[in-house]
């Protein structure tokens, strides 16, 4: 790369002229030094700048050189600028251009270069100030939106989803609370397909918030305030008492039978639960929970209060295929035959809030104020002697019984579900009322008399079975050990609807005398 050539003329800029003088003066002295050394000569340089400052260079001693100069008579060669220019033209140089000097003087910067570098630095600083702020810092928190379960408000979950919570919270990725699991919360849902939460006691499920939703028998979609996985067969307590055997972690011991004989402290509640029979809760139950005798004792201790909170289950599968006794515990775990919510919604009995008719039952009407609870049966309905009593007078006040659509046989198109689901017992059906037999290893406290549901569904009634859970009457426990495999009276028979009351009485007698 060649040297940069400049025009040999006076530099008008004072700064540039000073820089050029310094550089070229040093270059001249450098050349003089080289010449003096290489050629063994004496050189003296005397330079005055434009402000008459003296700059001199002497290879040995200036005085000696000057003395020789004064003593020398005639110079051998004397040149001026004109002679130099003429000599350059003869050698082929233009004389107007001169290359920049090399060596140490080229290391120095001119004022023009300094200004150029300074302007470039200022421009770069401006660019960094303008665009540097948009670059994110190394430590930043990216905001994200995550779903969390609300601990206080009741939620309505979809039948097809596991846990739907509408609340969203925006937090940072560095928030340690996002790494902690959410606490279980009570959910109010219509279908419980095996969610991970369950309540600590039945009192939280049977609070006063349900009183406004019961009694009028709304549609089964939005009526049950239950735990996320619990089913009617796993809730053996009616009036806010703790779950005795199902969830013993936070539950007090079960109250005695004498305490249960008092007047109920809550209004009658009707809870329609469309459970799909989740299998996941079976892993949480021990053998003691699945013991039929324990389940019977639980049902007997709660027999007097079972009328206050009946449970109407519309999706519990059948137990007939397994040959199990009618126990309240395993009713929600047979998923061989299920009635999904889509089929229930297509039925006229469950498609409207008025689908569940209560008939002439006075205890399941609109809820009365809390200070007027429905008392249990009067003292005249105390347990009779151990001998079986085949029938009761038909003028007796109709009892309340839970109704369930659990005993559905595969292939049965539900021909007996009419326009309403009546939960009253037929006045012409034989009724069995006897105390608990001690030989069955049940609780020695005898339950008050109650009735079983109708032997088979009628046009005005739904399919009835004792699989409605542990919120039923105590006679569930009486017949629980007596049923055995002969449960044909609960299957929807293919006989015509005009079957007389004598046939029903005969079938119920077969049931009670077994």
UniProtKB/Swiss-Prot annotation:
Biased composition (Pro residues): 367-396
Linked residues for Glycyl lysine isopeptide (Lys-Gly) (interchain with G-Cter in SUMO): 432
Record region (Beta domain): 286-292
Post-translational note: Phosphorylated on Ser-437 is which is required for Lys-432 sumoylation and inhibits transcriptional activity. Phosphorylation on this residue by CDK5 is dependent on p35 and calpains. Phosphorylated by PKA at Ser-121 and Ser-190 represses transcriptional activity in embryonic and postnatal skeletal muscle, and stabilizes protein levels. No in vitro phosphorylation by PKA on Thr-20. Phosphorylated and activated by CaMK4. Acetylated on Lys-432 by CREBBP. Acetylated by EP300. Deacetylated by SIRT1 and HDAC3.
Start and end residues of each MADS-box domain: 3-57
Pfam families: HJURP_C (PF12347), SRF-TF (PF00319)
Protein name: Myocyte-specific enhancer factor 2D
Organism of provenance: Mus musculus (Mouse)
């Amino acid at each position: 790369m060649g040297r940069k050539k400049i025009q040999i003329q006076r530099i008008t800029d004072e700064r540039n002229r000073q820089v050029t003088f310094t550089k070229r003066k040093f270059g001249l002295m450098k050349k003089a030094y080289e010449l003096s050394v290489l050629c063994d000569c004496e050189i003296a340089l005397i330079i005055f700048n434009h402000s008459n400052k003296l700059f001199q260079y002497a290879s040995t001693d200036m005085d000696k050189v000057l003395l020789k100069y004064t003593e020398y008579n005639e110079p051998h060669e004397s040149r001026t600028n004109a002679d130099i220019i003429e000599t350059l033209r003869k050698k082929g140089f233009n004389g107007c251009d001169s290359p920049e000097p090399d060596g140490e003087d080229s290391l120095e910067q001119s004022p023009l270069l300094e200004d150029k570098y300074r302007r470039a630095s200022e421009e770069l600083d401006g660019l960094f100030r303008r665009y540097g702020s948009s670059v994110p810092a190394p430590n930043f928190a990216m905001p994200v939106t995550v779903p969390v379960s609300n601990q206080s408000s009741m939620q309505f979950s979809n039948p097809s989803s596991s846990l739907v919570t509408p609340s969203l919270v925006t937090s940072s990725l560095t928030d340690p609370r996002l790494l902690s699991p959410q606490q279980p919360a009570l959910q109010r849902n219509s279908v419980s397909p095996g969610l991970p939460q369950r309540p600590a006691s039945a009192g939280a499920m049977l609070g006063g918030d349900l009183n406004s939703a019961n009694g009028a028998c709304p549609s089964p979609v939005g009526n049950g305030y239950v735990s996320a996985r619990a089913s009617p067969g796993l809730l053996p307590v009616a009036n806010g008492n703790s779950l005795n055997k199902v969830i013993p972690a936070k539950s007090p011991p079960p109250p005695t039978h004498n305490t249960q004989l008092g007047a109920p402290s809550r209004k009658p509640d009707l809870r329609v639960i469309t459970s799909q029979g989740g299998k996941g809760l079976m892993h949480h139950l021990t053998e003691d929970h699945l013991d039929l005798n324990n389940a019977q004792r639980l049902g007997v201790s709660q027999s007097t209060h079972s009328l206050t909170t009946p449970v109407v289950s519309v999706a519990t599968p059948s137990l007939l295929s397994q040959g199990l006794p009618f126990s309240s515990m395993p009713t929600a775990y047979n998923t061989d035959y299920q009635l999904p919510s889509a089929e229930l919604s297509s039925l006229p009995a469950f498609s409207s809030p008025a689908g569940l008719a209560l008939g002439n039952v006075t205890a399941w009407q609109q809820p009365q104020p809390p200070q007027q609870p429905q008392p249990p049966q009067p003292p005249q309905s105390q347990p009779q002697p151990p001998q079986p009593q085949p029938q009761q007078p038909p003028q007796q006040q109709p009892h309340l019984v839970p109704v369930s659509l659990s005993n559905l046989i595969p292939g049965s198109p539900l021909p007996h579900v009419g326009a309403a689901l009546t939960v009253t017992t037929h006045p012409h059906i034989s009724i069995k009322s006897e105390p608990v037999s001690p030989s069955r290893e049940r609780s020695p406290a005898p339950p008050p008399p109650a009735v079983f549901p109708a032997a088979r569904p009628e046009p005005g009634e739904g399919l009835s079975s004792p699989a409605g859970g542990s919120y039923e009457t105590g006679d569930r426990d009486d017949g629980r050990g007596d049923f055995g495999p002969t449960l044909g009276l609960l299957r929807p028979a293919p006989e015509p609807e005009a079957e007389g009351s004598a046939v029903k009485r005969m079938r119920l007698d077969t049931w009670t005398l077994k």
